[in-house]
Amino acid sequence: MRNVWLIVPFALLAAFSGETWAQADRDLYIDSTESSGNYPVDDDDYSSGSGSGIPAHDDDEDNVVLTTVQTLISSPSSEMPYVDTTTLKTQTKMAPETKEPGEVESTNTVLVHENKNIIQTATHTENLFHRTEVLAAVIAGGGIGFLFAVFLILLLVYRMRKKDEGSYDLGERKPSSAVYQKAPTKEFYA
């Protein structure tokens, strides 16, 4: 009966505190749901925006731009005719490639200098261990783990040596002094 009287107040406390939390949750948002940004679903703009819907043009075709620049020298002679420069720029769009599990970031950068017609390509492939902060954390963790292992081995060796010396308490009881009593030296002749 005593257990029932202990359980009843706790059950009532739980019921009233649950109701209080529900009331506090309702009082948290004073405004209506529309002013808080909770609108009904609007599917009118389903295909608009970046990366949604079917694209208007095909991304698999190559875009080729042909540029012809004629540079005329001020006075053409038989030694120096005019120069006809043709520049062919090709932009190829490729399908996105999936990353390997260990690879974090892969970026391709193409730098084009228009006046010198020099194209430089830089490729950055970076996996998890090429990042300096991850590498520093792995090295620090390995060092701390190594020190912990050395400390543990030294502690075990210390305890083994102490046990061999006999000063280590193994929990064994010493025999009482009554066991080591000297035998009587009196001799009885019968």
Swiss-Prot record:
Organism superkingdom: Eukaryota
Residues carrying covalently attached carbohydrate according to the record: S36, S48, S50, S52
Cytoplasmic face residues: 158-190
Membrane topology per record: Single-pass type I membrane protein
Region (Disordered): 34-60, 167-190
Main subcellular location: membrane
Transmembrane segments: 137-157
GO cellular component: cell surface; membrane
Compartments (UniProt record): Membrane
KW Transmembrane (keyword) present: yes
UniProt topological domain (Extracellular) ranges: 23-136
Key words of the record: Glycoprotein, Heparan sulfate, Membrane, Proteoglycan, Signal, Transmembrane, Transmembrane helix
The keyword rRNA-binding is assigned to this record: no
Signal sequence, renumbered to the chain: 1-22
Purpose of the protein: Cell surface proteoglycan.
PANTHER family cross-referenced by the UniProt entry: SYNDECAN, SYNDECAN-2
Name of the protein in its database record: Syndecan-2-B
Organism: Xenopus laevis (African clawed frog)
